[in-house]
């Protein structure tokens, strides 16, 4: 969570004096639940990718498992944007200036980026002897979350210096997201910034050191667009009006998300193509809109589950995982892909790999509970729905 100093309220904060949901409000548990869902989908993707072998790797089961693996990164980025909006609104209520808010957000993003670089270093050291040195500079999801938070901090700083209405903040965040998506096909092809060293260009289009953009990396274009979409939605949800109409906004957003999916598919089927190179699965703005629609639909379903369904019943493993998502992301990689993998790689049936997945899930849940206890946030853990915007991953 972003941590901001407590100062006396400033005059320009009067329009934000209405309370923002507190970190203790169980209404926000759905955000952590959704982040926990991203963790579980990530676990299954990595476990089956690492451990399935033989005919199992050619099965439809494996294909759908890896298709599900396209969801966690957009989910994490989308939720990071919502988290930043929460903290910005709360900081405005406390009277923070645009500069203070911007600096704190940029600093938190820089911390996540530093952790991403440290993670790459750890992976390189553990894999010493067979990993290429260029892996140190790979643009992975942690790097992109950090960069995205920094960019959101810059944007909030700039906008708040001139306009402080929620509508302005949400509209500009959404416009930035659409601009990132619209520029992605060009920056991956005809507008590539080839003048930059590849470690820097890779943050723009994921070129790495391979000469062409790589779809398995997470460059700013288009991935940061999901964070700004989350930021836009967060500003609406955490506004005074949004809090009063929370259920209606989320559910209408889910319906709008489904409509957006169909609209984007219709748009993509038009014969006119405005980009010189068409790549639906990696840079198409239409595919970006489809995934945004899917995120909105998932958010609505998760909200309903946590407010009116079993997700609101006492202890939730997904909420727990969502509160420590950075930790379980970091640790599970070593037990799935690393030298201390709990199963032999590419050597198991679906049943064997599923047993390994269950082991990873339970182990990461236990680790999460231990971390929560040690941090003093779990008294008691069972029966408690602590929400929010705990970590940006």
State where each predicted segment sits.
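Alpha-helical transmembrane segments and their immediate juxtamembrane cytosolic regions
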Residues: 2-5, 12-393
């Amino acid at each position: 969570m972003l941590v901001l100093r407590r100062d006396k309220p400033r005059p320009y904060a009067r329009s934000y004096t209405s309370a923002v949901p507190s970190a203790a409000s169980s209404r926000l548990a759905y955000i952590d639940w959704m982040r926990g869902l991203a963790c579980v989908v990530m676990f299954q993707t990595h476990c089956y990718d690492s451990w399935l072998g033989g005919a199992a790797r050619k099965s439809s089961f494996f294909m759908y498992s890896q298709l599900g693996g396209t969801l966690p990164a957009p989910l994490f980025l989308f939720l990071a944007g919502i988290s930043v909006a929460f903290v910005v609104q709360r900081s405005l209520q406390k009277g923070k200036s645009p500069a203070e808010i911007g600096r704190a957000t940029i600093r938190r993003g820089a911390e996540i980026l530093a952790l991403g670089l440290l993670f790459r270093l750890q992976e390189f050291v553990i894999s010493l002897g067979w990993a290429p040195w260029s892996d140190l500079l790979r643009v992975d999801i942690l790097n992109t979350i950090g960069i995205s938070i920094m960019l959101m901090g810059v944007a909030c700083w700039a906008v708040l210096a001139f306009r402080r209405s929620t509508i302005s903040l949400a509209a500009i965040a959404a416009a930035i997201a659409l601009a990132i998506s619209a520029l992605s096909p060009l920056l991956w092809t005809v507008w590539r910034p080839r003048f930059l060293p590849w470690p820097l260009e890779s943050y723009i289009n994921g070129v790495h050191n391979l000469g062409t953009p790589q779809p398995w990396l997470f460059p700013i274009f288009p991935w940061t667009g999901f964070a700004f979409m989350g930021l836009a939605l967060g500003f609406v949800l955490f506004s005074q009006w949004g809090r009063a109409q929370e259920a209606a906004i989320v559910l209408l957003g889910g319906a709008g998300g489904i409509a957006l999916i169909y609209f984007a598919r219709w748009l993509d089927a038009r014969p006119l193509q405005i980009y010189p190179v068409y790549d639906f699965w990696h840079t198409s703005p239409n595919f970006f809109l489809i995934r945004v629609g899917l995120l909105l639909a998932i958010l609505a379903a998760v909200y309903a589950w946590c407010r009116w369904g079993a997700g609101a019943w006492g202890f939730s493993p997904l909420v727990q995982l969502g509160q420590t998502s950075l930790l379980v992301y970091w640790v599970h990689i070593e037990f799935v892909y690393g030298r201390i993998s709990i199963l032999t790689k590419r050597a198991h049936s679906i049943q064997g790999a599923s047993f390994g997945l269950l082991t990873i899930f339970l182990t990461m849940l236990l680790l999460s509970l231990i971390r929560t206890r040690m941090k003093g946030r779990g008294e008691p853990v069972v029966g408690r729905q602590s929400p929010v915007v705990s970590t940006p991953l």
